[in-house]
């Protein structure tokens, strides 16, 4: 699973996900891409599950790119713990994804396999997604 090697701060504030993506809205590497239609926080486990589903469908042919990185530590307190006593420990890492952001890209496979792989990957994510083609 993806996680940052080094962090400036151990814990982060909750923050908000931007409504529309300012960068990362165009396909940069591959021929096909998976674009988000909602804004959301995606965990490193969800990214890994989507990657595995897509790569398995591609039968390890072609190339697969992940365009998002879970760099935000999300902390959580244990259940049935009273208020106070500081912020909880880091539970997982997440990536903030805005509307219009390209999440994954792939290349080197036929269009039918690419669409099927990206549909499987999109099913593993908590956002609505759309498959886009380069120059479309």
Curated annotation (Swiss-Prot):
GO CC annotations, alphabetized: cytosolic large ribosomal subunit
InterPro entries given in the database record: Ribosomal_uL16 (IPR047873), Ribosomal_uL16_bact-type (IPR000114), Ribosomal_uL16_CS (IPR020798), Ribosomal_uL16_dom (IPR016180), Ribosomal_uL16_sf (IPR036920)
Keyword Ribosomal protein on entry: yes
Keyword vocabulary terms for this entry: Ribonucleoprotein, Ribosomal protein, RNA-binding, rRNA-binding, tRNA-binding
MF-aspect GO terms: rRNA binding; structural constituent of ribosome; tRNA binding
CDD domains with a match to the protein in the record: Ribosomal_L16_L10e
PROSITE patterns given in the database record: RIBOSOMAL_L16_2 (PS00701)
Quaternary state and interactors: Part of the 50S ribosomal subunit.
Protein name: Large ribosomal subunit protein uL16
Organism: Orientia tsutsugamushi (strain Boryong) (Rickettsia tsutsugamushi)
Organism lineage: Bacteria, Pseudomonadati, Pseudomonadota, Alphaproteobacteria, Rickettsiales
Protein encoded by which gene: rplP
